């Protein structure tokens, strides 16, 4: 079940994830061989453990997310919370959507703009393919795209527009309703 909360030597992180990893079984085995004990069978736990493992040798959670993104393969968007930061990340192909919203001094990350409408938040922008955004009270929104090799082209999942997304959503600036 998500969100997943993980307590580890450097603190606590929460993670929610939309998508699928094509190399989750290999990553899971790698972690198990080094002592990880999993509580679930979900991809999200594999991602959380990789971020926690990378955090041991990183100066920040967002750096650990970037390092983990070089190992995980598939179509995904991630939301990671630490006690002081909200972090969003999108796979290098941009297969799964992720956007930023704001209401007053609060920020939101969501896979659909209609979720922002529901809580009265304004759409700020889409998270770009391969981008990590870090939101903190001290610095607002920061962006990093230096950690992941970019593919020549982005890709979109047609099922996002046809089956998953609500018609009143916008994905990467495109109205889902107009795509139907």
Tell what function each PLM region has.
Residues 1-129, 134-180:
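Conserved short alpha-helical segments that host acidic/polar catalytic motifs at enzyme active sites
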């Amino acid at each position: 079940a998500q969100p997943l909360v993980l307590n580890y030597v450097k603190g606590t992180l929460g993670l929610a994830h939309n998508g699928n990893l094509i190399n989750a079984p290999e990553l899971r085995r790698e972690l198990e061989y080094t002592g990880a004990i999993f509580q679930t069978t979900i991809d999200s736990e594999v991602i959380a453990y990789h971020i926690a493992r990378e955090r041991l040798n990183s100066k920040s959670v967002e750096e650990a997310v970037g390092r983990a993104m070089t190992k995980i393969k598939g179509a995904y968007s991630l939301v990671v919370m630490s006690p002081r930061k909200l972090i969003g990340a999108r796979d290098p192909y941009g297969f799964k959507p992720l956007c930023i919203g704001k209401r007053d001094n609060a920020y939101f990350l969501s896979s659909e703009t209609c979720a922002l409408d529901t809580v009265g938040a304004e759409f700020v922008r889409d998270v770009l393919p391969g981008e990590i955004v870090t939101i903190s009270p001290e610095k607002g929104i920061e962006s990093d795209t230096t950690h992941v090799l970019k593919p020549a082209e982005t890709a979109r999942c047609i099922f996002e527009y046809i089956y998953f997304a609500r018609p009143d959503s916008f994905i990467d600036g495109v109205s889902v309703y107009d795509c139907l």
